[in-house]
Amino acid sequence: MNTSYSQSTLRHNQVLIWLCVLSFFSVLNEMVLNVSLPDIANEFNKLPASANWVNTAFMLTFSIGTALYGKLSDQLGIKNLLLFGIMVNGLGSIIGFVGHSFFPILILARFIQGIGAAAFPALVMVVVARYIPKENRGKAFGLIGSLVAMGEGVGPAIGGMVAHYIHWSYLLLIPTATIITVPFLIKLLKKEERIRGHIDMAGIILMSAGIVFFMLFTTSYRFSFLIISILAFFIFVQHIRKAQDPFVDPELGKNVFFVIGTLCGGLIFGTVAGFVSMVPYMMKDVHHLSTAAIGSGIIFPGTMSVIIFGYIGGLLVDRKGSLYVLTIGSALLSSGFLIAAFFIDAAPWIMTIIVIFVFGGLSFTKTVISTVVSSSLKEKEAGAGMSLLNFTSFLSEGTGIAIVGGLLSIGFLDHRLLPIDVDHSTYLYSNMLILFAGIIVICWLVILNVYKRSRRHG
């Protein structure tokens, strides 16, 4: 009896170890190339609108994949999908490294990496629920969450060091480390019974087309792309109303509180992601810092602060309530952007503090947005609704990166608007920061109103 129990515990612990490895590298893959975007732009002689697709391509397939893998898990089995994700992620890494001298191949490789990496966040939580005993799940989720935060933290530092001292292309090989988990997962994960079901492939294709063409519009500003995107989304909406098992539940669209909360959350996440993608360009143009200095000295402290702010935010929600935390988070974000706009050419360490403010504000607002959205859902809508929120969060990050890249390239905001004496190289960035602050304030006011109304109706 004791031997059987100890063997079962050992098996669960081994599963948890390899899940932690996958979780860490999935986030690292997302963050590690961000600091190298200016280097990539210079090497290929590309504008930020094109160079940012190195991250946008990954986030696009990553966001769609996270939604798709969850729906496929019962039909194809978690074990098969995890192994598929690991191998595809590794394949994308090798293609990217071998063909890194050709920009189209690099973008293709990032699309492939996103397809593979999406399996990890989508399925890891399901594996914990199925394989880890109920009494240990809290610790398991906590450990995975800590490693995810660590991956977000060390990603920019690793990216900066490797890009500066070796070459950014070697960062593409980092995800291949997950291949070491394959033999252990094959041995540890049980074979599952498959459940027959229907996958709304038409809905997935229509929605993906709408997203891709909208992102292409934000980077090229060709209105033909916008028209195609609108048509694709229109057909998609008509489709999900008639489909037997639609990719997105159309009933969620009738929930005004849910829709507004999700859209505002997406705007905030996209704004912060766009800001983080802009920081390397800004620090190179204004302060002429190296990639290593930007990664470890500017972005790294902010990403690591997420661990502390996440804990503080959780305590404050319990003690002071969601509205209090929302206001503090929005204040940190908007004030951080405004201070950066007015002191953009001051000492670089000021930007380090601002990045800490921004990531702290993001931690606080993420908690509140999840609370607002979940409180607007009925019990039967909770699963589909929260999955759609996660999908929107990932997608908005990629969209934010694409939009910021487009704005940095067209020079629309490259004019002096603030009454301060600064160098011409700062005009574009300071105006972008003012725009970011405005978006945050508007979202704060809207979410505040939605939260109060949902509480009144709840």
UniProtKB/Swiss-Prot annotation:
Q: Which GO terms describe its cellular component?
A: plasma membrane
Transmembrane ranges?
12-33, 81-100, 111-129, 140-162, 165-185, 201-221, 223-240, 256-276, 297-317, 324-344, 346-365, 432-451
Q: Which InterPro entries match?
A: MFS, MFS_dom, MFS_trans_sf
Offer one example of a GO biological process linked to this entry.
Answer: transmembrane transport
The keyword Transport is annotated on this UniProt entry: yes
Subcellular location(s) per record: Cell membrane
Question: Its topology with respect to the membrane?
Answer: Multi-pass membrane protein
Using the record, list the residue span of the signal peptide; answer none if the entry has no such feature. none
Q: Name one GO molecular function term.
A: transmembrane transporter activity
Q: Does the keyword Membrane apply?
A: yes
Keywords from the named record: Antibiotic resistance, Antiport, Cell membrane, Hydrogen ion transport, Ion transport, Membrane, Transmembrane, Transmembrane helix, Transport
Tell me the protein's name: Tetracycline resistance protein
